[in-house]
Curated annotation (Swiss-Prot):
GO molecular function per UniProt: DNA-binding transcription factor activity; transcription cis-regulatory region binding
Species assigned in the record: Paenarthrobacter nicotinovorans
Function statement: Represses expression of the 6-hydroxy-D-nicotine oxidase (6-hdno). Acts by binding to a gene operator site consisting of two inverted repeats, IR1 (covering the 6-hdno promoter region) and IR2 (situated upstream from the 6-hdno promoter). Binding to one site may stimulate binding of the protein to the second site.
Induction pattern: Constitutively expressed.
Binding partners and assembly: Homodimer.
Cystine pairings recorded for this chain: none
Gene3D superfamilies to which the protein is assigned, alphabetical: Tetracycline Repressor, domain 2
DNA-binding feature ranges: 29-48
Residues covered by the HTH tetR-type domain: 6-66
Entry keyword set: DNA-binding, Plasmid, Repressor, Transcription, Transcription regulation
Annotated control of activity: 6-hydroxy-D-nicotine and 6-hydroxy-L-nicotine prevent HdnoR from binding to the IR1 DNA. Both 6-hydroxy-nicotine enantiomers prevent DNA-protein complex formation at micromolar concentrations, with the D-enantiomer being twice as potent as the L-enantiomer. A thousand-fold higher L-nicotine concentration is required to elicit a similar effect.
This protein's record includes keyword Repressor: yes
Protein name: HTH-type nicotine-responsive transcriptional repressor HdnoR
Amino acid sequence: MRISTVDRRQQLIDAAIRVIRRDGVESASLRTIASEAKASLAAVHVCFTNKDELMQAAAAELLQQLVRSIPRVVDGSEDVRAIAHRVMDLFWAQMVSDELNILAQFEIGIWAKRNPHHGDLSRTVYSDYEKEISKLLVAAAKRQKQTIAARNVARALIVIMDGCSLQYFADPSDPRHKDLCDNLVDAYLDRVGL
């Protein structure tokens, strides 16, 4: 049975994510990804120009998996502070329940930074994440008749997430990480008057 290019492309992206989660970016050769997807190497080259393009698609998919879950946990009546905490709670819950997914995102970002011709990948991923969080913050601010610098608040939340997640990965058994994360969010929101 023939598989459409669109379906094959998604299979390869999903296979790339599985390989990266299991073995890391350095082990994610096109041959390994093709094998994981039960596809030929030729099929990979039909769908993607090179490994860089496939890694970019995998990074975008990982981001979308995280972003798609955000609106489902947001109540339409919450204020900016509550939304900020809900976003952080969601991220934290996903990180704790699926550490490999978050590690894969970090690893793809680091891989992109080490490959100069793909340095924009991390910028694109973070920008997309900022946009999605900003939409939620803007909606909450409008309900409260507030004006906020939503992109700045979203960026700050992402910075806090990244720092706290690195601390968590250094010692997952330390129970203080989540409290520290919540305190950092509150301190930032207090500082900017939210």
